[in-house]
Curated annotation (Swiss-Prot):
Pathway: Cofactor biosynthesis; (R)-pantothenate biosynthesis; (R)-pantothenate from (R)-pantoate and beta-alanine: step 1/1. The gene is panC. GO terms for molecular function: ATP binding; pantoate-beta-alanine ligase activity. This is Pantothenate synthetase. It is an enzyme of class 6 (ligase).
Length: 284
């Protein structure tokens, strides 16, 4: 497995594979890898002959300097796991390499509409940072396929729209959320949980599933369901950040005609901000 941080070296290797007629799959990450990331790698391997993974803690998508500074960096362990998973190349650039003129002078990419909704409204600038860094990584790696987790539902929708709008010749593969046995969605941020908080954390998924069951059972008074779910989380020790039930395609408010919904959950438990989602299909 090659580990490189120089974009020129990366491009040389990509060009070599292209001359050999190899297909390339790409998995962008911020490191601190867990089984969810390795599942993305497995999916990537099934779609192409060569797999490239990037590890880059992207400062452009953090709205708090403290969060950026505290984000776990476990490069040695990550590379060992990726090597064992059969990855062909790991790209590990620094912020100075990715943004040589600094963030203030960096050209950015922004997807209108989706960038300002929901999570984007709570974290201004976050999705601008995501779309910019993903575009730059796509330009460097030039993959045929890129794999993203469905746990970050809005991010996946944003990447799909960006790729379509910009006519990028890349297939975007959404990979189902990987969960612990108790239902908690795997996330690098789970490492912020204390032992006691980790025991409480599955309540987020349980509450989400409760909402889905109510909707599927015929209760379509969504504001009431959101209020009850928020109270349920607060009673369990969470601090609810957002619960949204929206059209799964547009991510705009669901209407009486909406039949394809997604429940989007975000709540703090201690220092950790946990997110989850579930799609609900209603019969016509």
């Amino acid at each position: 497995m090659l580990v490189v941080n120089n974009p020129l070296v990366l491009r040389e290797q990509i060009s070599l594979w292209r001359r050999e007629g190899r297909s390339i799959a790409f998995v962008p990450t911020m490191g601190n890898l867990h089984q969810g990331h390795l599942t993305l790698v497995e999916q990537a391997r099934s779609h192409a002959e060569k797999v490239v993974v990037s590890i880059f803690v992207n400062p452009m998508q953090f709205d708090k300097a403290e969060d950026l500074a505290n984000y776990p960096r476990t490069l040695e362990e990550d590379c060992a796991a990726l090597n064992a998973a059969g990855v062909d190349l790991v790209f590990t650039p620094t912020p100075e390499i990715m943004y040589p003129q600094g963030l203030a002078s960096q050209t950015f990419v922004e997807v209108p509409g989706l960038s300002g909704l929901l999570e984007g409204a709570l974290r201004p600038g976050h999705f601008r940072g995501v779309s910019t860094v993903v575009t730059k990584l796509f330009n460097l790696v030039q993959p045929d396929v890129a794999c993203f987790g469905q746990k970050d539902y809005q991010q996946l929708a944003l990447i799909r729209k960006m790729v379509a709008d910009m006519a990028m010749p890349i297939e975007i593969v959404g990979v189902p959320t990987v969960r612990a046995e108790d239902g908690l969605a795997l996330s690098s941020r789970n490492g912020y949980l204390t032992t006691a908080e980790r025991a409480l954390a599955p309540e987020l998924a349980r509450t989400m599933n409760w909402i889905a069951e109510q909707i599927e059972g015929g209760d379509h008074h969504l504001p009431s369901l959101v209020a009850q779910a928020s109270q349920r989380l607060d009673n369990a020790g969470f601090r609810t950040d957002a619960i949204d039930i929206v059209d799964a395609t547009t991510l705009e408010s669901a209407t009486d005609k909406s039949r394809h919904l997604v429940i989007l959950m975000a709540a703090y438990l201690g220092k950790a901000r946990l997110i989850d989602n579930r799609v609900v299909m209603l019969s016509a």
